[in-house]
């Protein structure tokens, strides 16, 4: 993938959550909410505080979805990232 976010933007790949509950109930894709966390794949030159490979949590309605290499990513403004999961 050749994508470089500009300015204070970050490219994030959503982390998929489990599709089965603890009791074994399978949750269909259309009933699941989109995850609010993901892995940073690329960082713009002015985006500070996150690095490629880190797991981050972001605001619910943040970002713009883009399709690259048959995968869906989010381009987020650095201000929409709420924190880093360590």
Curated annotation (Swiss-Prot):
Tell me where in or outside the cell this protein is found: Cytoplasm
Provide this UniProt record's keywords sorted from A to Z: Chaperone, Cytoplasm
Function according to Swiss-Prot or TrEMBL: Together with the chaperonin GroEL, plays an essential role in assisting protein folding. The GroEL-GroES system forms a nano-cage that allows encapsulation of the non-native substrate proteins and provides a physical environment optimized to promote and accelerate protein folding. GroES binds to the apical surface of the GroEL ring, thereby capping the opening of the GroEL channel.
Record SMART domains: Cpn10
Instruction: Name the source organism.
Output: Campylobacter concisus (strain 13826)
The record's Gene Ontology cellular component field reads:
cytoplasm
Question: Which residue stretches, if any, does this entry annotate as coiled coil?
Answer: none
Q: Which GO terms describe its biological process?
A: chaperone cofactor-dependent protein refolding
Q: Which SUPFAM superfamilies match?
A: GroES-like
Broad class of the protein's primary localization: cytoplasm
Mark the transmembrane ranges. Answer: none
Superkingdom, according to UniProt?
A: Bacteria
Task: State what protein this is by name.
Answer: Co-chaperonin GroES
Please verify whether the record's keywords include Transferase. no
Identify one Pfam family in the record.
Cpn10
Its assembly, as annotated, is: Heptamer of 7 subunits arranged in a ring. Interacts with the chaperonin GroEL.
Q: Which family does it belong to?
A: Belongs to the GroES chaperonin family.
Q: Which GO terms describe its molecular function?
A: ATP binding; metal ion binding; protein folding chaperone; protein-folding chaperone binding; unfolded protein binding
């Amino acid at each position: 993938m050749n994508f470089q976010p500009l300015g204070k933007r970050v490219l994030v790949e959503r982390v998929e959550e489990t599709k089965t509950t603890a009791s074994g109930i399978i949750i269909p894709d259309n009933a699941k909410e989109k995850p609010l966390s993901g892995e940073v794949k690329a960082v713009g030159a002015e985006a500070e505080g996150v690095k490629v490979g880190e797991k981050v949590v972001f605001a619910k309605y943040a970002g713009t979805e883009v399709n690259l290499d048959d995968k869906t990513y989010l381009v987020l403004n650095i201000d929409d990232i709420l924190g880093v999961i360590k």
